[in-house]
Amino acid sequence: MNTKELIASELASIIDSLDQEAILKLLETPKNSEMGDIAFPAFSLAKVERKAPQMIAAELAEKMNSQAFEKVVATGPYVNFFLDKSAISAQVLQAVTTEKEHYADQNIGKQENVVIDMSSPNIAKPFSIGHLRSTVIGDSLSHIFQKIGYQTVKVNHLGDWGKQFGMLIVAYKKWGDEEAVKAHPIDELLKLYVRINAEAENDPSLDEEAREWFRKLENGDEEALALWQWFRDESLVEFNRLYNELKVEFDSYNGEAFYNDKMDAVVDILSEKGLLLESEGAQVVNLEKYGIEHPALIKKSDGATLYITRDLAAALYRKNEYQFAKSIYVVGQEQSAHFKQLKAVLQEMGYDWSDDITHVPFGLVTKEGKKLSTRKGNVILLEPTVAEAVSRAKVQIEAKNPELENKDQVAHAVGIGAIKFYDLKTDRTNGYDFDLEAMVSFEGETGPYVQYAYARIQSILRKADFKPETAGNYSLNDTESWEIIKLIQDFPRIINRAADNFEPSIIAKFAISLAQSFNKYYAHTRILDESPERDSRLALSYATAVVLKEALRLLGVEAPEKM
């Protein structure tokens, strides 16, 4: 039970009109620590008790007598709790030195499955910074859900089907060079894709030709299938090289094409349940009762199925295959309407588990305020960007620590970590402007800043030759260390909030706060000096390092021991 839960429990025993859960939600952290560590506002009780909130606060403060608090005082309409710093710091330091990286592990998920649909780049197109968002958010959510006791299944739903393959086949047959594609698959295929789109704007016959080739592909034409398979294989080799660099792995690469033979079954179920309506020759499902104006278009008048049909097939397959407790789609917010339709159609089909499906949308990445577009060739490609980030990180490491042994390895961890962290510290639904210089900076709210704080602590611990004792009698009661103790104690709740909101930025912001608090502590406290508090200060440094490293791991970011 953490401190807030303890306070909520104690208050619930003397408040009749609110239960522990409701009280927990009302608890606040005062902005000024002189007003206590935790505050309970009495406003919500005024109506029921028919008393002024100030009077209620005074009465509650008088009734509280737990040993866990230094004091409990009423200040206006608030009950302010001052915690026993020595007792709580002893508990927290004991917990972290004993549990180490397993501190804050929980078993909320009871080993149930969470399926995460993430990354999903388009075959034959470069892996851009736009795909990076889905990749790093999905990967971080996987770590977060595992931390609270779920098993995760990471699915890379590759964009390996669609009319764009018709366009690509036409372009390749007109202008393609097999050797050039083999040498630089994605670069060459992107050039062909951009060229055919540009020419199609003035020549509509190219569009028709592309549609015809895609029809051939759908009908199993040998030449079309061979080209499609080749484009897919070459692209995957390149994608996997990037995933290895990002240290992201997947449990399934079943993309759009995997569901080609599974869509007719979906149409049959919809038909059997009487859910399909005819509309201008097409077959649709009406979703007005869910407040969705546009019906879900299941089959076009020419018999072609659509994205939603494919996603329905994927949802049914995944439920059957993985028996998921949650199914998460980490896909841009421009797809929100699509996922509302998907859930509503599944609900219409009578599947209660549609409630377990969540679209986790994210905002756009821009460059100098401009939207990125593969079709127009205006993209930030990941591979050269990673190389540039690593190079910039190395320059700064050379300046800070020219004697460092494994500079290249550390620069790699810092450069890639910088890109990931910058993305993940942004509230997921917000976009951000891509600025490599800001990302790789060792100052400010960045990944390198947090990594450097961790490496600095490791240096302190090496100098002291500190090995934490699981039964160590560690305890602190000064104001500077108290700020750190409160953050470390809050880590389990932070992880839960990140999971509940599908929001890795909560962890990233926590890591920044913890690194800042430790750096402030380091500036004011002579940690290594001989004093009665020396071991406790070292234990606090150790606990901070453990939690910083674990917070970074939950974001998919490495923590180098030396920098």
UniProtKB/Swiss-Prot annotation:
**Known partners and oligomeric status:** Monomer.
Q: What is its main location?
A: cytoplasm
- Keyword tags: Aminoacyl-tRNA synthetase, ATP-binding, Cytoplasm, Ligase, Nucleotide-binding, Protein biosynthesis
Q: What's this protein's name?
A: Arginine--tRNA ligase
Query: Residues of the signal sequence?
Result: none
Entries under SUPFAM superfamilies matching the protein = Anticodon-binding domain of a subclass of class I aminoacyl-tRNA synthetases (SSF47323), Arginyl-tRNA synthetase (ArgRS), N-terminal 'additional' domain (SSF55190), Nucleotidylyl transferase (SSF52374)
Q: What chemistry does it catalyse, as a reaction equation?
A: tRNA(Arg) + L-arginine + ATP = L-arginyl-tRNA(Arg) + AMP + diphosphate
**Which source organism does the UniProt entry give?**
Streptococcus pneumoniae (strain Taiwan19F-14)
- Which biological process, per GO, is one annotated for this protein? arginyl-tRNA aminoacylation
> Nucleotide-binding: present as a keyword of the record?
yes
Which GO molecular function annotations are given, in alphabetical order? Answer: arginine-tRNA ligase activity; ATP binding
Is Protein biosynthesis given among the entry's keywords? yes
